[in-house]
């Protein structure tokens, strides 16, 4: 099993030193789901929400969150992201919204946390915009779908999960 990279020999948390790592193209994708009543989802899809375009706001929030991940997650490095993309899709058959984020850069550390943060904050934004009409909205699951680049190799979630 791999060792925890953010814990030193004394058991103390620290930020990993990436200065000796090679710069490679790194990419990560994550997803989040927001489940709600069919009436709430219809209001979003039909553009009838009194707060405005829920998907556009969630998309911008997710992009902004990816860029600020290093301020939210204590041991993350500040990164120069070259791409952040947020896709939102209504899934009326499940009364939910599926959010998929993509983050990319050429650098010395991965972008998994940025992708996860982007999807999570986009989901939280949907909740925030819809909580006046429905308080029992459910967020989750949130998960990493894939990552590529870097020394640890590629990862892709099993298609059956």
Swiss-Prot record:
<dbReference type="Pfam" id="PF01967">
    <property type="entry name" value="MoaC"/>
</dbReference>
<keyword id="KW-0501">Molybdenum cofactor biosynthesis</keyword>
<dbReference type="InterPro" id="IPR023045">
    <property type="entry name" value="MoaC"/>
</dbReference>
<comment type="function">
    <text>Catalyzes the conversion of (8S)-3',8-cyclo-7,8-dihydroguanosine 5'-triphosphate to cyclic pyranopterin monophosphate (cPMP).</text>
</comment>
<comment type="subunit">
    <text>Homohexamer; trimer of dimers.</text>
</comment>
<dbReference type="InterPro" id="IPR002820">
    <property type="entry name" value="Mopterin_CF_biosynth-C_dom"/>
</dbReference>
<dbReference type="InterPro" id="IPR036522">
    <property type="entry name" value="MoaC_sf"/>
</dbReference>
<feature type="active site">
    <location>
        <position position="128"/>
    </location>
</feature>
<keyword id="KW-0456">Lyase</keyword>
<dbReference type="InterPro" id="IPR050105">
    <property type="entry name" value="MoCo_biosynth_MoaA/MoaC"/>
</dbReference>
<protein>
    <recommendedName>
        <fullName>Cyclic pyranopterin monophosphate synthase</fullName>
        <ecNumber>4.6.1.17</ecNumber>
    </recommendedName>
</protein>
<dbReference type="GO" id="GO:0006777">
    <property type="term" value="P:Mo-molybdopterin cofactor biosynthetic process"/>
</dbReference>
<feature type="binding site">
    <location>
        <begin position="75"/>
        <end position="77"/>
    </location>
    <ligand>
        <name>substrate</name>
    </ligand>
</feature>
<comment type="pathway">
    <text>Cofactor biosynthesis; molybdopterin biosynthesis.</text>
</comment>
<feature type="binding site">
    <location>
        <begin position="113"/>
        <end position="114"/>
    </location>
    <ligand>
        <name>substrate</name>
    </ligand>
</feature>
<dbReference type="InterPro" id="IPR047594">
    <property type="entry name" value="MoaC_bact/euk"/>
</dbReference>
<comment type="similarity">
    <text>Belongs to the MoaC family.</text>
</comment>
<dbReference type="GO" id="GO:0061799">
    <property type="term" value="F:cyclic pyranopterin monophosphate synthase activity"/>
</dbReference>
